[in-house]
Structures are given as structure tokens and as C-alpha cells.
Curated annotation (Swiss-Prot):
Residues 1-13 form a transit peptide. One of its GO terms (molecular function) is protein folding chaperone. Belongs to the complex I LYR family. MZM1 subfamily. The gene is MZM1. This is Mitochondrial zinc maintenance protein 1, mitochondrial. PANTHER family: COMPLEX III ASSEMBLY FACTOR LYRM7 (PTHR46749:SF1). It is found in: Mitochondrion matrix. Its main location: mitochondrion. One of its GO terms (biological process) is mitochondrial respiratory chain complex III assembly.
Length: 111
């Protein structure tokens, strides 16, 4: 096992700790999934691809997964952390009108 593979594996375990802290069931399930995937690809002919994939998984977990906790009023409290990727909706707002086109004057036949 290469040091790069071991480093990618450890990074994935750290990513689960960041993403799923205080949720032991999900944390343990995520770690088991990573461990199983790592073991399955241990003797792979495409080791470099597997390392890249593991690093991408780590990055995705840390930057895109947030925990939500249901509050008494039925709303969810989202637990963002300092590495959570926060985007704005400007690109969505800009493309929305262009993609929708104009519905003004659209006619439909009713049968």
C-alpha cells in the first residue's frame, strides 16, 4: 500500500469526522463504507484512479454535507462549519429567465 493511498484513506476518515460529528450512527456507517471501498480497491490495477476518487470523496464530504437537526417547531437547524462551501444564487437567478423564456402570450388548447 502506498503512502499516497494511506494518506487519501486518512483524509476520508477525517472528512467523515468533520461532516458527521455528533451523529454516531451515520459516522460509523460512512467510515465502514470508506473502509470497505478501500479494502475492495486495495489490489486494484487502477490505484491512481482510486486515490483520486478517495480524495474527491473527502473534498465532497467536507465542503457539501451539512447536518440538519429538527427543532420543536418542525424547522431544521443546519450545522454549517468553517469548511462548508457556501455559494450564492446569482448564477441561478441569471440563468433562470434565459432558460424559462417568456410565457407571455402562450396559448393552450383545452379539450
Amino acid at each position: 500500500m502506498s503512502s499516497r493511498a494511506l494518506s487519501a484513506y486518512r483524509a476520508a476518515l477525517r472528512a467523515t469526522r468533520i461532516s458527521f460529528q455528533q451523529d454516531n450512527d451515520v459516522l460509523l456507517a460512512a467510515r465502514k463504507q470508506i473502509r470497505d471501498g478501500f479494502e475492495a480497491s486495495r489490489n486494484s490495477d487502477n490505484a491512481e484512479e482510486e486515490i483520486v476518487k478517495m480524495n474527491e470523496i473527502s473534498k465532497f464530504l467536507v465542503s457539501n454535507i451539512v447536518q440538519g437537526e429538527k427543532q420543536g417547531d418542525g424547522k431544521y437547524f443546519l450545522k454549517f462549519h468553517d469548511q462548508t462551501e457556501l455559494g450564492d444564487n446569482e448564477t441561478i437567478k441569471q440563468n433562470h429567465k434565459a432558460n424559462m423564456g417568456s410565457l407571455a402570450g402562450a396559448k393552450a388548447k383545452c379539450r
